[in-house]
C-alpha cells in the first residue's frame, strides 16, 4: 500500500491560509508549471506549503538559500510530517577549500575538505528514500544543483537480499566492494562490512546506529536481521533488504574500463596540445596527476577527486547536462523555492563562478578539460529539469513575477499583528527628532532598530547617542558571530535599547521587543533602499503591536512609494480581517531563548563567552574547544543544525584567536 502524506498538527489553516492552499493546489492539479506565494513575515508560509504537499501527494524538493535556513525548514517539516520521509540534503562539507590555482603567484591550493559524516548519512538517506517510497520531502540547499552520480547506476547497483535466496557468501562480499563498501572487522562504521564465519554484517551508508546482519546456511541466506551496531541487540527480523551504494559516484566494472580508456585518450590529446604550444611544465603536471588517478581507479575503483571524471564515468558527451539530485526524483514532483528572491539569483550565479575557477585549473595543467563538465546546472538546465515550482517569498523577485503574473497572497498573521504604519519626516533635524522617539520607546520598555547607509554614519550616530546617555550598540559586517549573539541577546534582555546597523535584513533580527524601525537616508536609491529591501526592513517592526516605521527623507523615491503603498495595502487587509473576526493584535511573547535558539547559538554558550579567547590559557582554550566540538556533534546528531552551525562558527573563531 502506498504511504500518504499526513500532517500531524494541533492547528488548522487560519486567516488567508485556506484560500492560499486552495489556489496553489488548484494550480498544481490543473498543470500550472509556476506559481508565486507572496507570504508576509510571520504568516505561517511553511504550514501553508505543508498543507499543499498533503493535498497534492507529490514527492517534494524544498530549496533554501543556506544551510541554516534549510535546517530550520527541515525541523519544521519533520514536526508536521512525523510519519513520512522528510530528508535533508545539503553540502556535506563542514569546511571546504576547493582546489584552485593563482597564476600571478604560481600558487596551487589543494582541495581541502572536512566531511560531516552525519550530513553524508542524511544525503544517502535522502537518495535511497526516493527509490523506496513516494511520500518523500527533501529539504536541500541550492548546492543540490551540483553534479551527482547517475541515478540509473545508483539504482542498478543496489544489492538486493531476501531470506531463502541462493547466494554465495564470497559473491556478496565482492558485490559490496563493487558498491564502495570496505571490509573492516575492527572499526565497524557507516559504509563498511565485517565477516564472522557464516555471518556478514553490513553498515548501510544511510544509517547511523543500525546495521544489517545476514546469516548464511551454505549458499543460502537463512536469516536477515536489523541490529544495533553498538550493542548487537536485535531490533527486527527482515524478509528483504536493499543495500544502496556507499557513494553517489559508483560505476560498473565494464563502464569503469571504458571510462579509463576515454580518460587516457583525452590525456593523450591534451598532452599533444600542451606540448605543441610549448607548455612543457603543464604537460608534465597533467600527466603525473592523471596517471596517478587512473592507477587508483584501476586498483580501487575510486580516487580522490573522482567527481572531476564524472563525465567519463557516466559516458556522457562533452558539454552534456550533469546528473543532479533532481534526476533522482520521479518525473511528477514538486519544487518549493523558499525565499525565492535570494535563491533564484543564487541558482543563476553558481555555474559562472564554478567555471571561472575550473578554467584556470585546466589552463595550467591541474585538470583535464573534461573536469569542466563536473559542474552545477546552468539556469536554463535547471528550468528544464523542474516539473512544477512554487516560489515563496515576502518580496518575490522580477523573475518569479514574470513567470507567474498571478500572485497568491498570504497577508494575515494568525496572531492578528499588523504591518506597521509608516511616517516620512525631513532629514533636517532628524537626529533630534529620532532622539525624542527613542526616549518614548525606552519609557515603555521597548527597543529600537536604526538602519543607516554608511559605516561612518553608523559609528557617528552610535557615539552621539552614547554621549546623550542612550544605551546603544552597533552591528556591522566585521562583528564576529560570537559578538553578534551577545548583541542580539542583550538587546532583547534590555541591556541596551537601541541597535544601529547598515544591513539589518539578516536572519535573527525578528525581535518582538522592537517597536520602532528608523530608516535614515531612505531617499538614497540603491541596494539597501530598493523596494524589496525597504519592505523587508519594514517587516522588522511587524512583531510588536505598537510597531512603527519612520523614514527620514527629503523626497519620496519610486522604491519608497512602492514599499509604502504595499505596506498600507497589507495593513488594510489585516485590519479588515481582525475587525470581522474580533481579533485584537498582541505582541508575540517569546522567551529570549526561543528566538535565539533558532537563529543564533543558545543561552548555554554563555559559558564559552565568559572569558575572551585571548585571555584564556592554552589549557583552558583546549578544554573549551573539546567541549564545544562534542556539543556540536551532539547537536548535529539531534538534527539541530542551526545550533551545530553556530557552534562550528564559534569554534573557528576560537581557534583563529588562539
UniProtKB/Swiss-Prot annotation:
The keyword DNA damage applies. Residues 26-413 form the Helicase ATP-binding domain. A motif (Beta-hairpin) lies at residues 92-115. Keywords: ATP-binding, Cytoplasm, DNA damage, DNA excision, DNA repair, Excision nuclease, Nucleotide-binding, SOS response. ATP binds at residues 39-46. Its main location: cytoplasm. Residues 430-596 form the Helicase C-terminal domain. InterPro entries: Helicase/UvrB_N, Helicase_ATP-bd, Helicase_C-like, P-loop_NTPase, UVR_dom, UVR_dom_sf, UvrB, UvrB_inter. The beta-hairpin motif is involved in DNA binding. This is UvrABC system protein B. Forms a heterotetramer with UvrA during the search for lesions. Interacts with UvrC in an incision complex. One of its GO terms (biological process) is nucleotide-excision repair. GO terms for cellular component: cytoplasm; excinuclease repair complex. It comes from Bacillus cereus (strain ATCC 10987 / NRS 248). The UvrABC repair system catalyzes the recognition and processing of DNA lesions. A damage recognition complex composed of 2 UvrA and 2 UvrB subunits scans DNA for abnormalities. Upon binding of the UvrA(2)B(2) complex to a putative damaged site, the DNA wraps around one UvrB monomer. DNA wrap is dependent on ATP binding by UvrB and probably causes local melting of the DNA helix, facilitating insertion of UvrB beta-hairpin between the DNA strands. Then UvrB probes one DNA strand for the presence of a lesion. It is found in: Cytoplasm. GO terms for molecular function: ATP binding; ATP hydrolysis activity; DNA binding; excinuclease ABC activity. NCBIfam families: PRK05298.1, uvrb. Belongs to the UvrB family. Residues 622-657 form the UVR domain.
Amino acid at each position: 500500500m502506498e504511504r500518504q502524506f499526513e500532517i500531524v498538527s494541533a492547528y488548522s489553516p487560519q486567516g488567508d491560509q485556506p484560500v492560499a492552499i486552495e489556489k496553489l493546489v488548484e494550480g498544481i492539479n490543473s498543470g500550472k508549471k509556476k506559481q508565486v506565494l507572496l507570504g508576509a513575515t510571520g504568516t505561517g508560509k511553511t504550514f501553508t506549503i505543508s498543507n499543499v504537499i498533503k493535498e497534492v501527494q507529490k514527492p517534494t524538493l524544498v530549496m533554501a538559500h543556506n544551510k541554516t535556513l534549510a535546517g530550520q525548514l527541515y525541523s519544521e517539516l519533520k514536526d508536521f510530517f512525523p510519519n513520512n520521509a522528510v530528508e535533508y540534503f545539503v553540502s556535506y562539507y563542514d569546511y571546504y577549500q576547493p582546489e584552485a590555482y593563482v597564476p600571478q603567484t604560481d600558487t596551487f591550493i589543494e582541495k581541502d575538505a572536512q566531511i560531516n559524516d552525519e550530513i553524508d548519512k542524511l544525503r544517502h538517506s535522502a537518495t535511497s528514500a526516493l527509490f523506496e517510497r513516494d511520500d518523500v520531502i527533501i529539504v536541500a540547499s541550492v548546492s543540490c544543483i551540483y553534479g551527482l552520480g547517475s541515478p540509473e547506476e545508483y539504482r542498478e547497483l543496489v544489492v538486493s537480499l531476501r531470506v531463502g535466496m541462493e547466494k554465495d557468501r564470497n559473491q556478496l562480499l565482492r558485490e559490496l566492494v563493487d558498491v564502495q563498501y570496505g571490509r573492516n572487522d575492527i572499526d565497524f562504521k557507516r559504509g563498511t562490512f565485517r565477516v564472522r564465519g557464516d555471518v556478514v554484517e553490513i553498515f548501510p551508508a544511510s544509517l547511523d546506529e543500525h546495521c544489517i546482519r545476514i546469516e548464511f546456511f551454505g549458499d543460502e541466506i537463512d536469516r536477515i536481521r536489523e541490529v544495533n551496531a553498538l550493542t548487537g541487540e536485535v531490533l527486527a527480523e527482515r524478509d528483504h533488504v536493499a543495500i544502496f551504494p556507499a557513494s553517489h559516484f559508483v560505476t560498473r566494472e565494464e563502464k569503469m574500463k571504458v571510462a579509463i580508456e576515454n580518460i587516457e585518450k583525452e590525456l593523450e590529446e591534451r598532452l599533444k596540445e600542451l606540448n605543441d604550444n610549448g607548455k612543457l611544465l603543464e604537460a608534465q603536471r597533467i600527466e603525473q596527476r592523471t596517471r596517478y588517478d587512473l592507477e587508483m581507479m584501476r586498483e580501487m575503483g575510486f580516487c580522490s577527486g573522482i567527481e572531476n571524471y564524472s563525465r567519463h564515468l557516466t559516458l556522457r558527451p562533452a558539454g552534456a547536462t550533469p546528473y543532479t539530485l533532481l534526476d533522482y526524483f520521479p518525473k511528477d514532483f514538486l519544487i518549493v523555492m523558499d525565499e525565492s528572491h535570494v535563491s533564484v539569483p543564487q541558482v543563476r550565479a553558481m555555474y559562472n563562478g564554478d567555471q571561472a575557477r575550473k578554467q584556470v585549473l585546466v589552463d595550467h595543467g591541474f585538470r583535464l578539460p573534461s573536469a569542466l563538465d563536473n559542474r552545477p546546472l546552468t539556469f536554463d538546465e535547471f528550468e528544464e529539469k523542474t516539473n512544477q515550482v512554487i516560489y515563496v517569498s515576502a518580496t518575490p523577485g522580477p523573475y518569479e513575477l514574470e513567470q507567474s503574473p498571478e500572485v497568491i497572497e498570504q497577508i494575515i498573521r494568525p496572531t492578528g499583528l499588523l504591518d506597521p504604519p509608516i511616517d516620512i519626516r525631513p532629514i533636517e533635524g532628524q537626529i533630534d527628532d529620532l532622539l525624542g522617539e527613542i526616549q518614548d520607546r525606552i519609557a515603555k520598555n521597548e527597543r529600537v532598530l536604526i538602519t543607516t547607509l554608511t559605516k561612518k554614519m553608523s559609528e557617528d550616530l552610535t557615539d552621539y547617542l552614547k554621549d546623550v546617555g542612550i544605551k546603544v550598540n552597533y552591528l556591522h559586517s566585521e562583528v564576529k558571530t560570537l559578538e553578534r549573539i551577545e548583541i542580539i541577546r542583550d538587546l532583547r534582555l534590555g541591556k541596551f535599547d537601541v541597535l544601529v546597523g547598515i544591513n539589518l535584513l539578516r536572519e535573527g533580527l525578528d525581535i518582538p521587543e522592537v517597536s520602532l524601525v528608523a530608516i535614515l537616508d531612505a531617499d538614497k536609491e540603491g541596494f539597501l533602499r530598493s523596494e524589496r529591501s525597504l519592505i523587508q526592513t519594514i517587516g522588522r517592526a511587524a512583531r510588536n503591536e505598537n510597531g512603527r516605521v519612520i523614514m527620514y527623507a527629503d523626497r519620496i523615491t519610486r522604491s519608497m512609494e512602492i514599499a509604502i503603498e504595499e505596506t498600507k495595502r497589507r495593513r488594510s487587509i489585516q485590519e479588515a480581517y481582525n475587525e470581522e473576526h474580533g481579533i485584537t493584535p498582541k505582541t508575540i511573547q517569546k522567551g529570549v531563548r526561543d528566538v535565539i535558539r533558532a537563529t543564533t547559538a543558545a543561552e548555554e554558550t554563555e559559558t564559552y563567552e565568559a572569558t575572551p579567547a585571548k585571555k584564556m590559557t592554552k589549557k583552558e582554550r583546549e578544554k573549551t574547544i573539546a567541549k564545544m566540538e562534542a556539543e556540536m556533534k551532539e547537536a548535529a546528531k539531534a538534527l539541530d543544525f542551526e545550533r551545530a552551525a553556530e557552534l562550528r562558527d564559534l569554534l573557528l573563531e576560537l581557534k583563529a584567536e588562539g
